[in-house]
């Protein structure tokens, strides 16, 4: 993966990859950037993958500008067409680092997913995050923090991912409170984006755990923000995994400068007002079905402690 900083580096990156006619996938809000190419798709999210692939028939690459929804959409098109993806992330979601993706309809409900995207490059520019609202800033940063935590204890963890996860956790812990208080602080935004970069790279190397499995199951059903759900689900997942991954979770806590990582994660989540699933409108009567769905996801299977649907339901009730 080629990573560059500053939107001004984008033309050079595209040329280096041999992309002369990129197809742009970005919502209307990014029109003022003046990016152009072989066409553009602005309906985000969307599950019209075949239509987008048809519109991109004359393109020699895909350029995604936006958060996880825009980048996931580009990855879905890439998996269909083989076109390389260059991402310009405007949130802290980390979607730019993994070839897997979810497909959502315009109401943000999950309608499919897969893997196999051809990822080629990333351009980070903190200026594009300066208008990100508080809830989305905190939510996507908490998603990045969950990437760090889970990379440290999933079954597929490794030494390289550990280093990146700890660095990402330290940076997010240090800078998220500042960003929450001063949304237009460019220096803090830059550091937080760097922390999310480390977190996303750790995710790509190690994978996801139970917290993400729960968040994905809930978000896919109701179209709820993935970051907000991770902010709520991560403390429960940490608590569940402590009996078998206590040392790894303690290392995560050290990166957060605390001996109570569960409490610190809750504190950071509260910066965005994220506390309980009921606050997001999740119906209590759906918890058993959500637990079943979460138990079947890859993150649950990679978790260091096996989790049955019944155990996951108990966790969901504890945060409902």
Where are these regions (language model features)?
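ATP/NTP phosphate-donor binding region
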Residues: 1-61, 277
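Short glycine/serine/threonine-rich phosphate/pyrophosphate-binding segments
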Residues: 8-10, 30-32, 69-76, 94-97, ...
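A short, small-residue-rich loop immediately preceding and capping a beta-strand
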Residues: 56-92, 214
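A glycine/threonine-rich phosphate-anchoring loop and its flanking beta-alpha core
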Residues: 76-160, 168, 244, 248-252
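Oxyanion-binding "anion nests"
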Residues: 169-215, 219
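Gly/Pro-rich interdomain helix-loop hinge
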Residues: 221-286
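Short, amphipathic C-terminal "tail helix"
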Residues: 286-320
């Amino acid at each position: 993966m080629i990573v560059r900083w500053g939107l001004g580096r984008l033309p050079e990156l595209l040329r280096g990859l041999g992309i002369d006619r990129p197809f742009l996938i970005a919502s209307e809000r990014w029109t003022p950037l003046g990016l152009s190419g072989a066409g553009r798709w602005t309906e985000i999210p969307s599950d019209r993958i075949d239509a987008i692939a048809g519109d991109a028939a004359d393109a020699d690459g895909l350029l995604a500008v936006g958060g996880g929804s825009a980048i996931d959409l580009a990855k879905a098109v890439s998996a269909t067409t083989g076109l390389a993806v260059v991402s310009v992330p405007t949130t802290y979601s980390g979607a730019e680092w993994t070839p897997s993706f979810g497909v959502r309809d315009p109401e943000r409900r999950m309608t499919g997913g897969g893997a196999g995207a051809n990822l080629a490059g990333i351009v980070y520019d903190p200026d594009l995050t300066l208008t990100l609202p508080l809830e989305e800033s905190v939510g996507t940063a908490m998603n990045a923090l969950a990437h760090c935590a889970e990379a440290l204890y999933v079954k597929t963890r490794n030494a390289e991912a550990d280093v990146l996860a700890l660095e990402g956790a330290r940076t997010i812990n240090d800078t998220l409170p500042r960003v929450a208080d001063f949304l237009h602080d460019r220096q803090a935004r830059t550091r937080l984006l760097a922390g999310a970069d480390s977190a996303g790279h750790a995710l790509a190397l190690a994978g996801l755990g139970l917290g993400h499995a729960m968040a994905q199951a809930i978000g896919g059903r109701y179209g709820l923000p993935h970051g907000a759900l991770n902010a709520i689900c991560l403390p429960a997942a940490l608590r569940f995994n402590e009996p078998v991954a206590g040392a790894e979770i303690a290392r995560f806590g050290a990166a957060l400068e605390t001996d109570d990582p569960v409490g610190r994660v809750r504190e950071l989540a509260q910066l965005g007002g994220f506390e309980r699933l009921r606050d997001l409108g999740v119906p209590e009567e759906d918890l058993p079905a959500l637990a079943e769905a979460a138990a079947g996801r890859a993150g649950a299977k990679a978790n260091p402690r096996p989790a049955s649907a019944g155990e996951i339901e108990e966790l969901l009730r504890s945060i409902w």
